[in-house]
Amino acid sequence: NPKYALSCIKAAYDQGARWVILCDTNGGTLPHEVTQIVGEVTKVVPGKNLGIHAHNDTGNAVANSLAAVLSGVRQIQGTINGLGERCGNANLMSLIPTFFLKKDFSSKFEIGIKSKNIKNLTDCSRLLDEILNRKPNQHLPYVGAAAFSHKGGLHVSAVQKDPKTYEHINPEEVGNTRNIVVSDQSGKSNIISRLKSIKIDIQENDPKIKKLL
C-alpha cells in the first residue's frame, strides 16, 4: 500500500525523525524499482534524510544502493563482505571504493574517506574472514584474491601493455595486487611474468619457455 507507506514516512519525518530508512527486507526489489520508489518518497521527505538498506536476494544489493544514491538518498547501510541474513546485505567493500574511485559519485558527493584508508579495504575484508574463521570469497569485486587475476595468455599480454584493458582500477588503490596465473591456458607472457615475480630474469626468446608451454 504505497499511499499508507508514504503517510507513515511523512508522519515520522514531521515528528522529528532524523533518518527514514527504506528497507528492501526480502531483497526482491530491482534497481529500476528503487529509482521509482525513491522518486516518490523524496516528494514527502528530503533525500538528505533518507537511507537505503538493501538485501542481496537477487544479487542487486549494491546496484540498488547505487540507484538509491543517484535518486537522492544520502545514507547507505551495508556490511563488510556483504555478510547478512540469507543472501547477505549490500557489500561495503564494493560500495566504498565505487563511491570513492568512480567519478559519477566522487565528483558529486563528499565521501569523507581518505585515500590512504581506501588502501586498507583488502586487508579489512580478509581480516574479518580470518576472525570469523570463514573461507574468503576470492571473487569479491575490488578486494577478492581473483579480482585482478589474469590467466589467459592474451589477457596477460594486454594487461602488461595497458592494464586498463582488463583492470578498471589500479589494484593497489584498494590494497589488492595483480596476480598472473600459470595454467594450461597460459602464454609466454604468463611464464615470464611469474618468473620475474620470483626474481628470475629470463629473455623472451629463451628456448626454456617453449618447453614450459
Where are these regions (language model features)?
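Alpha/beta enzyme core
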Residues: 1-50, 66-73
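Glycine-rich phosphate-binding active-site loops on the catalytic face of alpha/beta enzymes
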Residues: 22-24, 71-88
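Short, ordered loop/turn segments at secondary-structure junctions
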Residues: 24-27, 55-57, 80-82, 207
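Surface-exposed amphipathic alpha-helices with a cationic face
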Residues: 38-46, 96, 100, 129
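Small-aliphatic-rich amphipathic alpha-helix that forms the alpha element of a beta-alpha
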Residues: 53-79
